[in-house]
Design a protein with these regions (language model features):
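Short loop/turn segments that connect beta-strands within beta-propeller blades
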Residues: 49-52, 86-89, 126-130, 166-170, ...
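Short loop/turn and low-complexity linker motifs enriched in small/turn-promoting residues
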Residues: 7, 17, 280, 290, ...
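A short beta-strand motif characteristic of beta-propeller blades
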Residues: 14-19, 54-59, 91-96, 131-136, ...
């Protein structure tokens, strides 16, 4: 999951490019370092170069869940049929029947794509050809998007249990009981952060599930967390943005938001960007939480913004989809560079000679 990039984002900056889709996409977009992927309502998937806003390719595919990208493959599912598309060319890589309708966005792991079915099965499909590596039945309804780490898949259940499933064989490595229904999880380095409906953010050690710390808020912790080397940043349904010590969980600062957050915050260098139900983004200083800028949007944001890496043809930028089908990139807008002319443009004309007027 994302940690801070070295470059600093120019915020609020301006709109680098904008694409309007009518009708809007059927699912929230997937992102990787090169593209944004949109599931269109006409049975196609479009890859948009998020440096320029241009279409890289369009492929015939539908998905009843939000897709996900590994950088090499884009994966999704149309009902019971899971599929993978080559992210570079747009060609279909494979299709597989997973036995039951896909229930959530697939998790991206080193071993393959992990799908959750409506029957409660977790299914790992290999990257190479989509064959089923293992299948594991969950003991209770899954309440949070599945998250993959280097060695485990983490599953949050409606009854408050958090499971670590081994990627190698699908067996349960450990189980931890939290205080309530698990809503969201984020795996960052040596910590697994879990938000729950008891208003706590929990920090666990991924290798054994040991509880490192927890912090109570005034509302459900329903969004992803982000972290730098010192602090963890997260929002909750009490419309607050908080920073806590990454190692010990002590509160460093908290700031009220003007609206309820949509998705989790985005960390860009020394700034934290938060989207809400209003058509705008807000930036806060990571050091003390002071709000520094606001950027207007053409519609209500549908997810937390994706931080796209700096490219030869584009600066560091935020990419997001808003209500109304507006996909846009926000960052530093660069005017064309001024260069000296080798010669004057146009055709050389002889000097005009005015007639002599006799009086």
């Amino acid at each position: 999951m994302p940690e801070a990039l070295a470059q600093e984002l120019a915020f609020p900056g301006g709109v680098i490019w904008q694409v309007t889709l009518d009708p809007p996409p059927a699912q929230l977009p997937a992102f990787d370092d090169r593209s944004a992927y949109l599931v269109l309502r006409d049975g196609h998937v479009r890859a948009v170069d998020h440096a320029t806003g241009g279409t890289r390719w369009t492929a015939p595919a539908s998905s009843t869940v939000r897709p996900a990208s590994s950088g090499r493959h884009l994966v999704g599912a149309d009902g019971v049929t899971a599929w993978a598309i080559d992210a570079d060319s747009g060609r279909e890589a494979w299709r597989r029947d997973i036995g039951s309708t896909a229930a959530a966005v697939p998790a991206i792991s080193p071993a393959g794509a992990v799908f959750l079915t409506e029957q409660g099965d977790l299914v790992l499909l290999a990257w190479v050809d989509g064959h089923e590596v293992w299948r594991a039945r969950m003991p209770a309804p899954v309440s949070a998007p599945v998250v993959a780490g280097p060695d485990h898949v983490f599953v949050g259940l409606d009854d408050g249990h958090l499971l670590a499933i081994r990627l190698g064989d699908g067996a349960t490595a450990w189980t931890k009981t939290l205080g309530a229904r698990i809503l969201e999880m984020t795996s960052i380095g040596d910590r697994l952060f879990a938000g729950a409906s008891d208003n706590f953010l929990y920090a666990l050690k991924p290798k054994d599930g040991h509880l490192a710390w927890r912090w109570r808020t005034g509302g459900d912790v329903a969004g992803l967390a982000v972290a730098d080397q010192r602090r963890v940043y997260f929002t909750s349904l009490d419309a607050m943005l908080r920073a806590v010590d990454r190692r010990h969980g002590d509160l460093r600062w908290q700031r009220p938001l003007t609206t309820r957050a949509v998705g989790g915050p985005t960390l860009a260098g020394t700034q934290i960007i938060v989207s809400g139900v209003a058509p705008e983004l807000h930036a806060f200083r990571a050091s003390d939480g002071g709000m520094t800028a606001t950027a207007p949007l053409p519609g209500r944001p549908l997810h937390g913004p994706f931080l796209a890496p700096e490219h030869a043809s584009a600066p560091l930028r935020l990419v997001l989809l808003t209500a109304g089908g507006h996909l846009l990139a926000i960052g530093q807008t660069v005017e064309p560079r001024l260069v000296p002319l080798d010669g004057l443009p146009g055709k050389k004309l002889p000097p005009e000679v005015l007639p002599v007027i006799k009086r």
